[in-house]
């Protein structure tokens, strides 16, 4: 069986030097992710993306730059889970641990 090469990625974009509340910057980053052909799930500590790796990389770069436009410093991280042996989706991963 051939699977579409989806990846699941966890993204965190943190603006520094703008006080304790960063929600307005997080919202801007999420708006960028939603412009792309990606599944976007936000949680309390980051955002999980599902889709084509190239789309995720483009969206990540744009979201990082968008936040950096408003602040002097941004720390961003991107974790990518890519596999060839089975379909890789957020839903499959949650089912595997009994969370869905």
From Swiss-Prot:
InterPro entries: MTH1187/YkoF-like, Thiamine_BP, UPF0045_domain. It holds the Pfam family Thiamine_BP. It comes from the Archaea. Coiled coil: none annotated. SUPFAM superfamilies: MTH1187/YkoF-like. Belongs to the UPF0045 family. PANTHER family: UPF0045 PROTEIN ECM15. This is UPF0045 protein MJ1052.
